[in-house]
Structures are given as structure tokens and as C-alpha cells.
Amino acid sequence: MSVDPLSSKALKIKRELSENTPHLSDEALMGLSVRELNRHLRGLSAEEVTRLKQRRRTLKNRGYAASCRVKRVCQKEELQKQKSELEREVDKLARENAAMRLELDALRGKCEALQGFARSVAAARGPATLVAPASVITIVKSTPGSGSGPAHGPDPAHGPASCS
């Protein structure tokens, strides 16, 4: 088996070039522009060029993945914050709804009592007595500054108030 002196000499020169090339840190490798990187890679073996380019790509991908993880964590925290705010709002509205239902039930009871009283008065006067029509005033109770409910009495579009 004979060794070709030219190929061993070329291999020796390539090794010397590889050994003599300045080692680039990961930060420096990532910070280089493509033009600067290509300038650095001139004169290196194809193996060394491939290795450095692959190393640079791996480092850049790592950075992209890390920033993606950070972004995802921030989005998750923001969504959890929004969820908590919405849950508090739902609880508040449920409490307000329950309070309004109680108030409505109390008003229905008063209305029914008044209607019963009106029927008993009408029955005591007898069937021949005409009862003058009465106007109904609706009082809406709301918390100050809530802005709910009519501002100036009942809505004429909905007709007279009833208990049901």
C-alpha cells in the first residue's frame, strides 16, 4: 500500500489551517453577519465550513426557541390574569343578579298585596260603584351612579306596570 505524497501533504496543510484558525466563541459566531462569516470561512476545509455553519444555525435556533418560550410564558400569564378578572366580574354580576331577584320578589309581593287590597275595597263598595282609574307610579331603586333603570319614571313604550 503506497501513500500518495501529494494527498498527505494537502491533508497536512488543511490540518494546519484548521489548527491555526482562530476559535470563534458562540456569541461571536452568532453575531457575525453572513458576509463576515463567509470572510472567516475562506480557506477552511469544507468539513470545517459545514461544522461552523451548522454550529451557528444550532445556536440561532436555540435563541429563537428560548425567545418563543419566554413569549409563550408571558402570553399564558396574561391570559390567566384576564381569566381571573373575568371570573371576578362574573361573580360580581351573579351577586347583583341575586340581589335584584330578591328586590323583584319583594316588589311582586307588595304589588299583589296592593291588588288584593284594591279588590277588597272594590268588593266592599259593591258592584254598582264605579271606581275611577288610578295611575300607577313605578319606582325603580338603583345604586347611585349605576346608570341602570329609567331616569324619569316608567317607559311609556312598555305600557302600564304589572306585577308579573
Curated annotation (Swiss-Prot):
GO terms for molecular function: DNA-binding transcription activator activity, RNA polymerase II-specific; DNA-binding transcription factor activity, RNA polymerase II-specific; RNA polymerase II cis-regulatory region sequence-specific DNA binding; sequence-specific DNA binding; sequence-specific double-stranded DNA binding. InterPro entries: bZIP (IPR004827), bZIP_Maf (IPR004826), bZIP_sf (IPR046347), TF_DNA-bd_sf (IPR008917), Transcription_factor_Maf_fam (IPR024874). One of its GO terms (cellular component) is RNA polymerase II transcription regulator complex. CDD domains: bZIP_Maf_small. Residues 149-164 have a biased composition (Low complexity). Induction: By oxidative stress. Gene3D superfamilies: 1.20.5.170. Residues 79-93 are annotated as: Leucine-zipper. Residues 51-114 form the bZIP domain. Expressed in the term myometrium and kidney. Keywords: DNA-binding, Nucleus, Repressor, Stress response, Transcription, Transcription regulation. Residues 141-164 are annotated as: Disordered. It is found in: Nucleus. GO terms for biological process: in utero embryonic development; negative regulation of transcription by RNA polymerase II; parturition; positive regulation of transcription by RNA polymerase II; regulation of epidermal cell differentiation; regulation of transcription by RNA polymerase II; skeletal muscle cell differentiation. Residues 51-76 are annotated as: Basic motif. SUPFAM superfamilies: A DNA-binding domain in eukaryotic transcription factors (SSF47454), Leucine zipper domain (SSF57959). Signal peptide: none annotated. Coiled coil: none annotated. Belongs to the bZIP family. Maf subfamily. Monomer and homo- or heterodimer. Interacts with MIP. Forms high affinity heterodimers with members of the CNC-bZIP family such as NFE2L1/NRF1. Since they lack a putative transactivation domain, the small Mafs behave as transcriptional repressors when they dimerize among themselves. However, they seem to serve as transcriptional activators by dimerizing with other (usually larger) basic-zipper proteins, such as NFE2L1/NRF1, and recruiting them to specific DNA-binding sites. Interacts with the upstream promoter region of the oxytocin receptor gene. May be a transcriptional enhancer in the up-regulation of the oxytocin receptor gene at parturition. This is Transcription factor MafF. It comes from Homo sapiens. The gene is MAFF.
